[in-house]
From Swiss-Prot:
Protein name, as recorded: Phosphate-specific transport system accessory protein PhoU homolog
GO BP: any one term: intracellular phosphate ion homeostasis
NCBIfam families tied to this protein: phoU_full
Family stated for the protein in its record: Belongs to the PhoU family.
Keyword Cytoplasm: yes
Known partners and oligomeric status: Homodimer.
Organism this protein belongs to: Methanocaldococcus jannaschii (strain ATCC 43067 / DSM 2661 / JAL-1 / JCM 10045 / NBRC 100440)
Record key words, sorted: Cytoplasm, Phosphate transport, Transport
Compartment(s): Cytoplasm
An example molecular function term from Gene Ontology annotations: protein homodimerization activity
Gene3D superfamilies, alphabetized: Phosphate transport system protein phou homolog 2, domain 2
SUPFAM superfamilies: PhoU-like
């Protein structure tokens, strides 16, 4: 392939890493805003989500142009197609961070939202995201598979959070709205974990030409999409 094509691949790689870093920062700030009831920070996170949307469009445009101009095959083609998929998935991670802030901004509850499990989930998700991008950059199949498998732990953490909040609702039903908001925030983090796991699967495909468990992932994401739609309707 021409040198220009290799330069485009490198540009796309750098763009994806930058996008992932912004998604991690948005997730960090979203949870911080939520637990501290910092509405100004929440507004900033919501505003910056547009930047992530634009980055996705930029990456997709570069990849499509490269495919049209150079007609790559095999590994090069898989890399460009994977980049398009990853950028789309990162955009959804950014959306979920924004939606956590939306919960706060639409709420009239001023209670204490601080929850250690929520913080642990956030830290774990950001670690998953960082590992996914290391796997992408270094073409580390083993690490990409680890990212895929890490999602189970995040699911377990969400279950703990959910059960804890249900217990609190039973004990103190007057705080139903507050505890429900914490559940929704945790669900958006858990949803992002599923998305990052699917990024791990895509990286394995880029490296080997094979998916990990394609049908399982697609079915899980479909279920999560239905749940997310219901949550969004409640929060609208």
């Amino acid at each position: 392939m021409p040198k220009k094509f290799e330069e485009i691949l490198k540009e796309v790689e750098n763009d994806l890493i930058e996008m992932a870093e912004l998604c991690a920062e948005q997730t960090e700030n979203a949870v911080k805003a939520f637990i501290e009831s910092d509405r100004e920070l929440a507004k900033q996170v919501r505003k910056r989500d547009t930047t992530i949307d634009l980055m996705e469009m930029k990456i997709e445009e570069k990849c499509i142009k490269a495919i049209a101009l150079y007609q790559p095959v095999s590994g090069d083609l898989r890399e460009l197609m994977t980049a398009i998929k990853i950028s789309s998935k990162l955009e959804k991670v950014g959306d979920n961070a924004s939606k956590i802030c939306k919960i706060l901004l639409k709420s009239d509850v001023e209670g204490n939202r601080k929850n250690e499990l929520l913080i642990v989930m956030k830290d774990y998700l950001i670690n998953m995201l960082k590992n996914a991008m290391i796997a992408f950059k270094t073409r580390d199949e083993s690490l990409a598979r680890d990212v895929y498998n890490m999602d189970k732990r995040l699911d377990d953490l969400y279950e703990q959070l959910y059960r804890s909040m249900i217990s609190k609702i039973i004990e103190n039903p007057k705080n139903l709205t507050l505890y429900t908001e914490i559940i929704f925030a945790g669900k958006y983090l858990e949803r992002s974990g599923n998305i990052v796991a699917s990024i791990g699967d895509r990286i394995v495909y880029m490296i080997t030409g094979e998916r990990i468990k394609e049908e399982e992932i697609e079915e899980e994401l479909k279920k999560e999409k239905d749940i997310e739609k219901n949550i969004d309707q409640i929060n609208d």
